[in-house]
């Protein structure tokens, strides 16, 4: 496997470290860097990622590592830990390197098995998802006992340094949360209905930022922006596949289904094709979850093309829940204010409207 120059540089910078963070922009190949580092440490590997990425991680390890090894106990094998069978096979595997992949939401529910792991490498894909140290999944991950840690994220804090402490803790920087907040974050108090709340100062939120970044690099963090990597192709295409739902397959078989109190009847070739597309769009939990995970994984400006109004409304709800400003271009309106003013905006464009 041949890595890009910037990926080789990231590995070279951290070659002597066993706790590292690769904060690389989307499209720079964090998966390749993280996997290469993990395999070089020669330990069992536990990967925690978004649910939609489990198959991608398994495919990556089989394609670039396992399929090129001997199929015996001196090699490696990768297991999906979301099933009881996969977890049991992982725990009792006799391969030299056991690789287990599990999603954040399920990991903390597998405490009995995972808290007993020792002498392993923990790799967190989209490590920004543990920034809320009060959440169950974050608390659990901080309880694990890995020998090595690899953090992967394009937006480790979304620019909010007050959310960085959990990742700092995993990198081995021995600073308490209280001291960290006093040294690097400017807090202010506000009165809300007689209750005093502490919030980050809006005008001057952070302090000692240069020292903070220096300490992060000292503890294995590599920051890399797209514009710094001149050897990249001009465009990077990333295909994200999602499975078709059981409702889709039932409709394709029977040509009729009731979903969300609405009956879809494919009594002609045209209506069947139309409803099939809707079942893969606004009615697809898999596709909407993949969209949510994409938005969570980056603070870049996003442009999303859509077909149906119901599909747009479902995605807008997700964007609002995640606090992302939106713009819209369709047959009824053209509002680009947030696109022009907010660098983390999401612009929704209806296909036909986008052509005009």
Predicted segments, located by residue:
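Conserved helix/coil segment N-terminal to the catalytic DExD/H
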Residues: 87-118, 135, 139
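Conserved Walker A/P-loop ATP-binding site and its immediately adjacent core
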Residues: 33-36, 42-63, 158-163, 306-312
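Conserved helix-turn-beta segment of the N-terminal RecA-like "Helicase ATP-binding" lobe
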Residues: 53-84, 171-175, 323
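Interdomain linker/hinge connecting the two RecA-like lobes of the SF2 helicase core
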Residues: 18-21, 127, 133-134, 164-168, ...
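Conserved helicase ATPase core of P-loop NTP-dependent helicases/translocases
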Residues: 303-305, 312-355
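Conserved pre-motif I regulatory segment
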Residues: 1-23
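Conserved P-loop NTPase motor "coupling/switch" region that bridges the ATPase
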Residues: 44, 63, 75, 89, ...
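Walker A/P-loop
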Residues: 17-37
